[in-house]
């Protein structure tokens, strides 16, 4: 949002000095309206004078030049000019005398053009950066005094424009009046001097109402509509002050009528629209939803197919505007317009937002309507100001008007407790200052008691809905810098109640799984009994914990996390074909094996605990590649390794036919283990779901889904999470292709390489070493070129030194020795291992 400093000062009625642009920027930023930049305009224009043409003759040596006799208020000068729109003798122009420097950097000096001296320059608005028209010179009004400085006659020529970053909850700050209101309230409360707004009066010439002028057929989408029929309009270019003001704010001047509506947009934040009433069938408008297959050509020349949910402004026959977004070409104001219907309305923000997005049409009007404009006195004030300017600049007069209301939002009443404000802010805002702040923001305060203020919110502040919003307003204007610094540490430090070890372990594991690209779900702990029967080999039916009052057939506490994850997989695959990567952290429940009470109990356990269901905290992971693609269990074990690393554990994989689980494919499952002082500890399993389980959940036959689970209680405690310094020098990598029997797990191949690297003798002060944690399995190939019963593993190994970069001459012999030693070790268990 661009705010003109000069215009803002015109809107402020201050007893004290006017804030400088820098001071104003500091005030606004402190109020939450962050000033992102200051743009200064008019440098060099201070030297521009009002020149009067005393005579003009054709240049004797150049057909396109005119020799002008120009009076600058003190002397008559000769100036050569090539413009074709020179005014007649007596006309006024913008004159740059010798020595002036234009905004673009051009310095005016005496020149001789084809033998005729030129003692200055007659300027265009483009050369003065007052507009974009560079085809002709800038012609000034005849009433401007000759010899006067131009910037003293036209407000805004020398100006500073503040660029604000307005947050979406402050639609009132999308106009100069709203920003000026904040500044006035701030100055009144902080300085104690009188500060108020200068606003145009709410009056209009006596004119009869015509209720047929406007009809609202969609009252839930249009809360208020003011329509004014204006006649005797003369469309012409806007005066210089209006053109300059719009140009400084980034808008292109078009004509007096259109420019007036744009000026009101920037002044009040209220969009207005002018229809050519002569082009409206019946001379009236209807606010309605678009008809089926109705179309509209908007002002940008685009033919748009309207949706039945679009709100339109129509005449007796067709849609004439997309309400709150853009007008229609068929009723636009043109040079021949003599009758106008002026619209000032409040539309429901949600509908305008939907239409703007549906048609990919964002405008200054829709930007404000989407956030909520004033439907109260601000709407009337913008309309009255526009009517006054139309009468002044275009000669128009109002012959009829109408006000129609639909479902208009009510004014909110909020109870404010000063004691509550002091408690939340940590500082008590003095009563007088608080009342002054609220009054400056036009919030009506009715004191029902010393600690109970009933506040009526103005219609221009839709963001004020709760007591804390009013407290926030008090803090904005009282100032964060007024909050005293307080030593908040308690005198007697007490130890904080920390989370238990299992909770911390679960949180870290969940963080690691999220970092690995998995999404966490939370499913119900109650499931249908028939779903748990698929896991009866692990937890038999007699250990099910049944619920006394089951809901929707879910009468058993879950013994496994997999049913909830599979339900989520079915739900997602039925709606999209994208990959599904899920995990859940939760408890499972089962009765203990046997009901005998032991003679002794572990420390911290009560005797009654053995008669309660056993609870295990588990982590379940499920990966599906999307569509009919197959998930790779290795991607799952990689995610597990990354997550366990956050807990300080290194993952080990081991396979075998003993201790297999029935819900995983018997040929594609491994045990998950972590290192401990006593050796590897099994903490879970991973692999591919059994085809029978895929069929039981109605998933496509042949679909391969990876699943893994971790028992958090089985993880050994780690007091210190392992960490190391990030290497300062890059490692170098070597790719290794090994031909191995299919039965030999890749984990054993990596372990052999790791052992070979550790056994490699070191040489020198900073030897090259194999990075044990950096080995990767890039590819598992089975097919042409590989003997039957074997596969080709493509591995990547990384080598580095602690304090320097390494060279190929160092790495190559090291790599060859490690590969040879690892292959020898592997051949003892699986003959046929060889590099490719």
Residue ranges and their predicted role:
Residues 4-7, 11-12, 26, 66, ...:
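Glycine/proline-enriched, intrinsically flexible loops and inter-domain linkers
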Residues 183-217, 394-421, 428, 470:
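Terminal amphipathic helices with adjacent charged low-complexity linkers/tails
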């Amino acid at each position: 949002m661009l705010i003109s400093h000069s215009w803002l000062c015109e809107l402020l009625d201050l007893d004290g000095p006017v804030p400088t642009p820098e001071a104003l920027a500091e005030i606004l930023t402190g109020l939450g309206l962050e000033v992102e930049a200051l743009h200064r305009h008019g440098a060099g224009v201070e030297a521009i004078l009002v020149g009067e043409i005393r005579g003009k003759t054709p240049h004797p040596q150049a057909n396109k030049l005119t020799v002008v006799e120009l009076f600058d208020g003190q002397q008559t000068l000769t100036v050569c000019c090539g413009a074709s729109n020179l005014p007649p003798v007596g006309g006024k122009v913008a004159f740059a005398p010798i020595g002036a420097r234009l905004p673009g950097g051009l310095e005016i000096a005496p020149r001789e053009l084809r033998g005729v001296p030129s003692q200055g320059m007659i300027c265009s608005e483009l050369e003065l950066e007052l507009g974009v028209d560079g085809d002709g010179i800038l012609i000034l009004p005849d009433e401007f005094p000759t010899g006067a400085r131009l910037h003293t006659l036209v407000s805004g020529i020398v100006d500073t424009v503040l660029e604000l970053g307005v947050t979406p909850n402050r639609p009132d700050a999308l106009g100069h009046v709203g920003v000026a209101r904040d500044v006035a309230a701030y100055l009144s409360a902080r300085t104690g001097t009188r500060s108020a707004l200068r606003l145009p009066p709410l009056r209009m010439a006596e004119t009869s109402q015509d209720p047929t002028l406007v009809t609202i057929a969609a009252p839930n989408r249009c809360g208020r509509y003011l329509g004014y029929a204006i006649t005797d309009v003369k469309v012409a270019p806007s005066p210089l002050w209006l053109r300059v003001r719009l140009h400084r704010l980034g808008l292109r001047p078009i004509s007096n009528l259109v420019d007036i509506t744009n000026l009101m947009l920037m002044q009040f934040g209220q969009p207005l629209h002018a229809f050519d009433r002569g082009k409206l069938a019946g001379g009236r408008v209807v606010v309605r939803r678009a008809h089926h297959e109705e179309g509209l050509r908007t002002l940008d020349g685009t033919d748009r197919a309207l949706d039945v949910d679009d709100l339109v402004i129509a005449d007796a026959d067709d849609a004439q505007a997309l309400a709150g977004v853009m007008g229609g070409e068929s009723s636009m104001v043109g040079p021949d317009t003599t009758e106008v219907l002026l619209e000032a309305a409040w539309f429901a923000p949600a509908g305008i937002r939907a239409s703007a997005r549906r048609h990919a049409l964002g405008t200054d009007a829709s930007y404000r309507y989407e956030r909520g404009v004033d439907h109260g006195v601000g709407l009337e004030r913008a309309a009255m100001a526009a009517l006054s300017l139309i009468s002044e600049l275009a000669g128009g007069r109002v012959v009829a008007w109408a006000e129609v209301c639909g479902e208009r939002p009510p004014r909110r009443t909020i109870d404010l407790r000063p004691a509550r404000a002091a408690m939340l802010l940590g500082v008590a805002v003095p009563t007088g200052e608080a009342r002054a702040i609220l009054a400056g923001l036009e919030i009506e305060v009715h004191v029902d008691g010393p600690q109970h203020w009933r506040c009526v919110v103005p219609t221009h502040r839709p963001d004020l809905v709760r007591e804390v919003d009013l407290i926030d307003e008090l803090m904005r204007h009282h100032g964060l810098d007024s909050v005293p610094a307080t030593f908040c540490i308690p005198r007697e430090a007490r130890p904080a109640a920390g989370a238990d070890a299992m909770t911390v372990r679960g949180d870290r594991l969940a963080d690691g799984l999220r970092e690995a690209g998995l999404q966490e779900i939370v499913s119900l702990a109650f499931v249908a009994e028939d779903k748990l029967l698929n896991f009866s080999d692990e937890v038999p039916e007699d250990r099910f914990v049944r619920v006394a009052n089951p809901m929707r057939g879910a009468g058993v506490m879950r013994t496994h996390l997999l049913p909830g994850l599979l339900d989520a997989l079915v739900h997602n695959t039925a709606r999209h074909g994208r990959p599904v990567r899920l995990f859940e952290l939760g408890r499972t429940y089962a009765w203990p094996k046997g009901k005998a009470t032991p003679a002794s109990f572990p420390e911290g356990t009560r005797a009654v605990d053995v008669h309660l269901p056993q609870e295990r905290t588990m982590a379940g992971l499920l990966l599906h590649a999307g569509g009919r693609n197959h998930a790779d269990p290795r991607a799952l074990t990689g995610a597990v390794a990354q997550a366990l690393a956050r807990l300080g554990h290194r993952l080990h994989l081991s396979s075998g036919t003993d201790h297999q689980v029935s819900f995983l494919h018997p040929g594609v499952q491994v045990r998950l283990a972590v290192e401990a002082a006593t050796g590897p500890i099994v903490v879970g399993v991973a692999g591919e779901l059994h085809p029978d389980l895929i069929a039981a959940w109605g998933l496509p036959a042949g679909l391969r889904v990876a699943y893994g689970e971790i028992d958090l209680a089985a993880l050994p405690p780690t007091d210190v999470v392992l960490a190391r310094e990030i290497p300062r020098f890059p490692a170098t990598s070597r790719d290794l292709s090994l031909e191995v029997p299919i039965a030999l797990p890749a984990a054993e191949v990596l372990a052999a390489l790791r052992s070979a690297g550790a056994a490699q003798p070191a040489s020198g002060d900073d030897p090259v070493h194999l990075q044990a944690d950096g080995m990767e399995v890039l590819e598992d190939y089975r097919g042409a070129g590989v003997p039957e019963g074997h596969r080709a593993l493509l591995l990547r190994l990384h080598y580095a030194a602690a304090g320097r970069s390494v060279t190929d001459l160092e790495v190559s012999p090291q790599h060859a020795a490690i590969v040879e030693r690892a292959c020898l070790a592997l051949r003892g268990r699986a003959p046929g291992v060889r590099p490719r």
